């Protein structure tokens, strides 16, 4: 149902569906329905499956629950309200569950104040935080509405006594479905809902999905209902007015020092904070969130602006108690500014925010809209967002993302396909609900959207593994099910294993870093360790170290004083640029380049950028200069969505760098770069280095090796890429960590067993032993899944193959320049990413400035007279 239909639906049509009591309460409290409510309530009342997509503050929750509450109240007045669970609300966040309980109790309390004889509607929360006593109480007196998480829902289904209480549920609500659909956690929940429908539910229940702005809605709806389920979509994604602007903190992004940029950023932030009641600032890393909060507190104190206690940080590394305290203070209006990484993107109720500021690119349109949507917590209030950029690439990227957001063009989500570790848990869960025919269970699993293309061989391999038919008993991997006469049933002890080990979220480990001689240095996050390769140099506690190897759950390093870091310490936290957005950035570059090449007057181009993209003159001028410099440097070539530029650059360290300017998003670039590096490494018979960014990648070869780089795509056959990359990643740190995660999800490694918890250190050591064993087993499902997860979920091999096919058939042209002793302007950030760390931000800006000066000198040496103004004042 589109937005115009929703807006034109008379309120009286919806009110007429309610009992007089609920109709009166609604009219007195809210007066009018929001578009999502106008669309969803009548459909839910009719028993239709519904996906509601709309921004924060548009009344989604009430749209889902009001019809349900009204039906329960009506049943109560008719003395037909039984002691049973009628509705299940499933949310990915426990904090959302507590919010939801409060949000449901409030209207019921207000209704009871109006009508003292209102039937009692009970609400219960069942998560890992719920005490055994509370769970026992639920068995005796189940709540009418059950609030839970995917993991606790799974445990409920295999609990013999409690699942009886779930047999007559009428509605299942999945909140924040956009957060679930693109993860294994979502695949797990989708599978659990299918098992619930097939084995426990007496009747067809209504599925209601609540989502922030997401695309494509059809795919998310299919994920919600599974199989051949019918559904209706309420598309109210763009119902709230949105005001998004990109801001440059300095007039000249090229020549400003790091100090000038920082002064510009914080001056801007303080000015905006003063003008608004509550400001929410998003950074892209937890480290940056802490840094910005600290700096603002200090400025508030030193300049006597506000009390420094009015500033708080909120991110996932903080304790739950600290996060809850910040959320409560926000709701009560006791904070002036909160700085967050990603933790406040989801729909936790955080009260009134009138400005959202993003420091640097959010990397996708949907994330931009989600973050900005936190401002103006009512449907008629403007969601006001400002994006502060730090360099020219950031400016170009954010300019395009902001325009796409205003034009309502959203990136498509990625839904994991056939995650075999999740399948393992679903087969075990099914066996614990009831003994089942193996072939019948396959048909049920195929109804789950994530498993629609699952082959019988893949399914059978997982079942055989669970039945202990791979001979892993000597490695203490025992059967969890038995298969006899085509029937699957659980082995003794399997129920307890499921209770203690089910779920898909891996334990996050801090990895100890040790010197070769055994001295302790500090800790690194596991995500960071998995991207390291021998020889990588990184910063820890302000000093540089070279990665040698990992041993079990430790990292072995040696000092590398004076050497530049090759991997930024925040790299693993960085959000990847979405593929669809990357393609649009390529188109934007091409559009500006074409105008310049066609000799459209400079002022006309700049005015056009200003008006079409809502930019200041400084920002538009900066983009114009950036593209023009690249054109002058390359002799008229700018990398776009239709042209891949390969630049050969010989650096001062006698290395040859092959720089691939390909805007395809980080996940695609990651896969593409490793495949190309494999070809070059094989041809030259030497190790090469890779540096990956959102705007392309650099492959560095020691010594100025001659290599015909333009022919590399002739050697890279698309149908061999999966095989090549599988082979490549089997030699990385990543495979060790990811295999442990998949082995834990597959019950190969047990986190908890017989009342004992196994440490992550011990599990990592055990997993590496198991990895060595299963590498010898053909088509072993847990290893196959580890490779699939890395290539399809972490990277995007499908898009990488698509790009190679387009290059080989001529849809994407390839141009080559060099070798040069100076890198082109567009190459600077790709190269600088190799050499910079957060502690060296000043060095990064100096290096960029130095590279820019070399470009100007390079052009003048070629007889090209550069005359570009860099600020409105006309600095030449």
UniProtKB/Swiss-Prot annotation:
Residues 41-232 form the Helicase ATP-binding domain. A motif (DEAH box) lies at residues 175-178. It comes from the Archaea. It catalyses: Couples ATP hydrolysis with the unwinding of duplex DNA by translocating in the 3'-5' direction; ATP + H2O = ADP + phosphate + H(+). Disruption phenotype: No visible growth phenotype, signficantly reduced survival after UV treatment. No change in sensitivity to methanesulfonate or hydroxyurea. Slightly further reduced survival in a double deletion with upsE (an ATPase implicated in mating). ATP binds at residues 37, 60-61, 175-176, 374, 377. Its EC number is 5.6.2.4. Residues 422-506 are annotated as: WH domain. The keyword Ubl conjugation does not apply. InterPro entries: ATP-dep_Helicase (IPR052511), DEAD/DEAH_assoc (IPR013701), DEAD/DEAH_box_helicase_dom (IPR011545), Helicase_ATP-bd (IPR014001), Helicase_C-like (IPR001650), Lhr-like_ATP-dep_RNA_helic_prd (IPR017170), Lhr_WH_dom (IPR045628), P-loop_NTPase (IPR027417). Probably part of a 4-gene DNA damage response locus in which the upstream ups system, in combination with this downstream locus, functions in homologous recombination to rescue Sulfolobales from DNA-damaging threats. DNA helicase that translocates in a 3'-5' direction on single-stranded (ss)DNA. Binds Holliday junction (HJ) DNA, Y-shaped DNA, DNA with a 3'-overhang and single-stranded (ss)DNA with high affinity; binds double-stranded (ds)DNA with less affinity. Has helicase activity on DNA with a 3'-overhang, Y-shaped DNA and HJ DNA. Does not unwind blunt-ended dsDNA or DNA with a 5'-overhang. Belongs to the Lhr helicase family. Lhr-Core subfamily. Monomer. Composed of 2 helicase domains, a winged-helix (WH) domain, and Lhr-specific domain 4. Uptake of species-specific DNA by Sulfolobus and subsequent homologous recombination are thought to be involved in DNA repair; the ups pili (encoded upstream of this gene) are probably responsible for species specificity. NCBIfam families: PRK13767.1. This is ATP-dependent helicase Lhr-Core. It comes from Sulfolobus acidocaldarius (strain ATCC 33909 / DSM 639 / JCM 8929 / NBRC 15157 / NCIMB 11770).
